[in-house]
């Protein structure tokens, strides 16, 4: 059963060491170039089954087979903006959300690396997967998208969380 707690709590600490009980989804943003090595990725890389290496493999192969939770259905997930790779790691399901491209300059203005349309699609995919599980506990998240990716946490990310993940308990970890 999905936990309909409808609350967002902020904590200080390492999101990969979240102490909440039960199955936790850990969504974070990855880029569409297969490059990772800073921020929360450094902690996720040390987790069981190395979700970051799985992301790099997904990038190299350009697709992977993902079993849809709670079903026998297997779907090919192509590596592109807006897609999510789900990697089980102990009590976590790490969600590698492809929502970032290099910064660009358009009409002499810097465009942030984050692609909010892609992040929205990723977050919707995460919500769909959560709803298929009856042992889901909560989402434990870093402040994704608001540092190197260039989004404003309060203006850009929080409204997406409140809209798409409104039915779930969410713990935001600030490191």
Language-model regions: role of each:
Residues 1-175:
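Macrodomain-like recognition of ADP-ribose-binding/processing modules
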């Amino acid at each position: 059963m999905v936990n309909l707690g409808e609350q967002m709590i902020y904590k200080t600490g390492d999101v990969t060491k979240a102490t909440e009980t039960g199955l936790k989804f850990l969504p974070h943003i990855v880029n569409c170039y297969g490059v990772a090595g800073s921020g929360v990725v450094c902690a996720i890389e040390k987790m069981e089954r190395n979700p970051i290496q799985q992301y790099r493999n997904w990038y190299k192969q350009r697709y992977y087979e993902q079993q849809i939770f709670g079903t026998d259905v297997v779907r090919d997930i192509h590596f592109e903006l807006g897609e999510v790779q789900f990697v089980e790691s102990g009590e976590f399901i790490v969600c590698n959300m492809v929502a970032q491209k290099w910064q660009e300059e358009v009409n002499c203005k810097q465009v942030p690396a984050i692609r909010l349309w892609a992040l929205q699609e990723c977050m919707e995919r995460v919500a769909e997967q959560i709803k298929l599980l009856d042992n889901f506990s909560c989402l434990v998240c870093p402040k994704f998208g608001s540092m190197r990716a260039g989004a404003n946490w309060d203006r850009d990310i929080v409204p997406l969380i409140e809209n798409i993940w409104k039915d779930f308990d969410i713990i935001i970890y600030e490191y």
